[in-house]
Design a protein with these regions (language model features):
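Polybasic low-complexity intrinsically disordered regions
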Residues: 1-90, 97-98, 145
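Basic, amphipathic alpha-helical segments enriched in Lys/Arg and hydrophobic/aromatic residues
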Residues: 83, 90, 95, 104-149
């Protein structure tokens, strides 16, 4: 899943996420089924979810070759991600979508785990807003915050 975060005037790369109306950076995370952080990728917010997911999967295919099943939200649906998964390995992606009949908030299976991880990261004051000048330091602070989970 991904999270768009506002940046400060400290500089560094930032973009505009038109869907969430946020100028800043986007964090893509991959968690295990317990919600513990496996991988994080931070980049400008103007990159779509399905495009950022390809970069996340490229980073983890060597480190975690035993992964087989990936759950994702509707923002990751599309042929681009399925093609990247086919090239990277023998992975199955399951898109968890909201039902058309749902009104308001609905807890979705498997997706709430990632949202809970974002909430855990959001409890860290340094991660509530992206204060860092570089993407590398922004990634590092998120990894440091995940140690206490």
């Amino acid at each position: 899943d991904s999270q768009s975060v506002k940046t400060t005037e400290s500089g560094g790369p930032s973009g505009y996420d038109a869907g969430k109306k946020v100028k800043g950076r986007k964090r893509h995370i991959l968690t295990d089924t317990s919600g513990f952080l496996i991988s994080i990728l931070v980049h400008t917010a103007d990159i779509q979810d399905r495009d950022g997911a390809v970069d996340v999967l490229k980073r983890i295919c060597q480190r975690f070759p035993w992964l087989r099943h990936i759950f994702a939200d509707g923002g990751y649906a599309g042929d681009k991600l399925r093609t990247a998964l086919a090239k990277a390995g023998n992975w199955v992606i399951e898109i968890i979508k909201r039902s058309d009949k749902a009104k308001g908030f609905e807890v979705l299976p498997h997706r709430w785990v990632v949202e809970r991880t974002f909430a855990w990261l959001g409890r860290c004051r340094r991660l509530a807003k992206d204060w860092e000048a570089t993407v590398a330091s922004s990634t590092a602070w998120a990894m440091i915050a995940s140690i206490r989970m």
